Amino acid sequence: MGSTPFCYSINPSPSKLDFTRTHVFSPVSKQFYLDLSSFSGKPGGVSGFRSRRALLGVKAATALVEKEEKREAVTEKKKKSRVLVAGGGIGGLVFALAAKKKGFDVLVFEKDLSAIRGEGKYRGPIQIQSNALAALEAIDIEVAEQVMEAGCITGDRINGLVDGISGTWYVKFDTFTPAASRGLPVTRVISRMTLQQILARAVGEDVIRNESNVVDFEDSGDKVTVVLENGQRYEGDLLVGADGIWSKVRNNLFGRSEATYSGYTCYTGIADFIPADIESVGYRVFLGHKQYFVSSDVGGGKMQWYAFHEEPAGGADAPNGMKKRLFEIFDGWCDNVLDLLHATEEEAILRRDIYDRSPGFTWGKGRVTLLGDSIHAMQPNMGQGGCMAIEDSFQLALELDEAWKQSVETTTPVDVVSSLKRYEESRRLRVAIIHAMARMAAIMASTYKAYLGVGLGPLSFLTKFRVPHPGRVGGRFFVDIAMPSMLDWVLGGNSEKLQGRPPSCRLTDKADDRLREWFEDDDALERTIKGEWYLIPHGDDCCVSETLCLTKDEDQPCIVGSEPDQDFPGMRIVIPSSQVSKMHARVIYKDGAFFLMDLRSEHGTYVTDNEGRRYRATPNFPARFRSSDIIEFGSDKKAAFRVKVIRKTPKSTRKNESNNDKLLQTA
């Protein structure tokens, strides 16, 4: 694997990191040789004095290194104590890696290493944000590089909240600046299977016991013994429960307790689909009333999506009926949502109810503690569930290592119990705040109302007046103010605890130079769309049956009219309708955008935008139209077309081509 260039800064600027140069630290070897010939001089002279002083300095430094090596040797010898880990998910494997790197003897017990918590390969990718990637770097830089190379960067693009019906931006998230300003890796998504394979390979086959389900444990005060489902028993010095939201270790510690149902069921799937704005947008959260939809680029020409809907737990769909129900739930939503559903195969869709667990004030007892979902399972809305488990893993390994060092210095037994308490205390507040944020994000996403009248039953007619809902206006004001500080703390608030990790940004993480412009200018962001533009016949009464492809040649004019014109040098769209004039309208492409100009037609040209507002185009004045708009040539709706933008895919990707054909047929 080729090395990746790094940009290091000893004193990084809080506002900007230089991505233009590469600085590399050269580690100092413990075994070093110095040429002392330059210090030779006359005995008793200044040069001789300096020579003796330099030699003494070297001897002192050598003695210090030898003392440190002896201390490390003693420490490594004492660290042959055993750490038991229940659960081989992300949290369990990352902690096992961290503990192993610190010199501990680790054993991981997992009931089914191939299942990814029972949801198989279709559960898809997981988002690893900057804070977790930095913690992983502090644990093992080589493993972190493998993860980052295998992942798809989303933090270098626009991410945020949009209106589910219109698809217009509500709030944009800047996850790049907090990472770059603090010298952190940029957020990525990676396949769970790939991530688990990388971690398992780094931990080692000799450490992981597959098909080993921990059902009980015994804490004698000096040792901990785990009991497997098959009756086997293993003894160690401490036990870490990383066995997920339904943790058996947690139940045995504190008694059985019910997880908290979020009120939402979640459908999820992966589609072979490339959006037209893939270069500029990483992920979106589409907001709605009592439902919301999340889509994210996961690399390799694939998109992952989650569809949340408020309903009681325990529901089920008819056989092969999930896709049909999703179209019913999200009927009338924007093309960004519907296109993904169309492109997803029925068998690639999973459904699960969403639960979480409140962290609580006590994470463990005696020589047993908990980590990740087993103590603070979160709703997926912040994308921080796995990230918090990785942070937990680093901190727990650090506290155990500090306890060993203290025992070596004081020649006293290792205080395992106190080290576990310190781990819990150091993590409790941050985890509780982010856990609460995840719950709040779910509430905000599902109670969103674009217009006054939404969700008001008999008063729903008010929505036709398009009066912005007060909650929408106030919510946006609050989010605009609070979001930058919140993201800065979530992504960078733990970085100061990552001992031994210098602030650094990978040169390959550099964002597009236009990123700041995209944040501030929706129009500039929209012009980054790359795809073919189509006019698709709209409505049962449309007099045209074929789909029309628009040209993006700025030098070739395009005229819409009722009669062909052999002498016309440009593109001619002929619509045989009584309300379409001979020279009805002109379509213009300029600087990445399409415009429509009515040529003083008798019956006019009308545009209905993605928020449902219909207006008549002013004659001889170019009017911008966008994807999902409805264009009517004449007022009788017999020449109505829906604007559609579809990414142009390589001819070799037949599956994507068939998806594009499917989108054209179903639009």
UniProtKB/Swiss-Prot annotation:
EC number(s) stated in the UniProt entry for this protein: 1.14.15.21
GO molecular function, one term: FAD binding
Induction: By ABA and drought, salt and osmotic stresses.
Catalytic class of the enzyme: oxidoreductase
GO CC term, one of those recorded: chloroplast
One GO biological process term: sugar mediated signaling pathway
Protein name, entry field: Zeaxanthin epoxidase, chloroplastic
Species this protein is from: Arabidopsis thaliana
Presequence boundaries: 1-59
